[in-house]
Amino acid sequence: MFYSVQLQWVVKEKVTAYGQNLTLFCPIENCCSKPAGWFVRSKTIIIDVKTFSNDPKVEYHGTHNKDGFGFVIRNLSEADLNVTYHCIYGFDQSTPKYLLHGDVFRESK
């Protein structure tokens, strides 16, 4: 039986300022038996989060657990906003979605 997984990434936790790390998360039950990756501006950044290097000098890194996989943007800057991101799992992929200011920052009280 063939079925398609509907992928949609979310911001895992909003930040308070530029310069912090921001994680985008693509929820998948029983992750990650298939390659799980990320695209930024239609460019492949991570082919598979399980094998991607987590070198602290690299702007991005990948995470995964049984509930899904993540994309960490280190040292968030304005250049990371208003561009499209999408996740891919096996042959399924999310629709490219813009990362907007309101998605990223916690509202000040």
Predicted regions and their residues:
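Short, charged low-complexity linear segments at domain edges
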Residues: 2, 59-65
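N-terminal Sec-dependent signal peptide, specifically the hydrophobic helical h-region
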Residues: 1-12
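Solvent-exposed loop/turn motifs of extracellular immunoglobulin-like beta-sandwich domains
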Residues: 16-25, 64-68, 74-87
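Extracellular/luminal immunoglobulin-like beta-sandwich modules
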Residues: 76-79, 84-109
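Hydrophobic beta-strand residues in large extracellular and virion-surface proteins
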Residues: 9, 24, 38, 58, ...
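N-terminal V-set
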Residues: 25-59
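Disulfide-stabilized cysteine-rich extracellular repeat microdomains
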Residues: 15, 21, 31, 43, ...
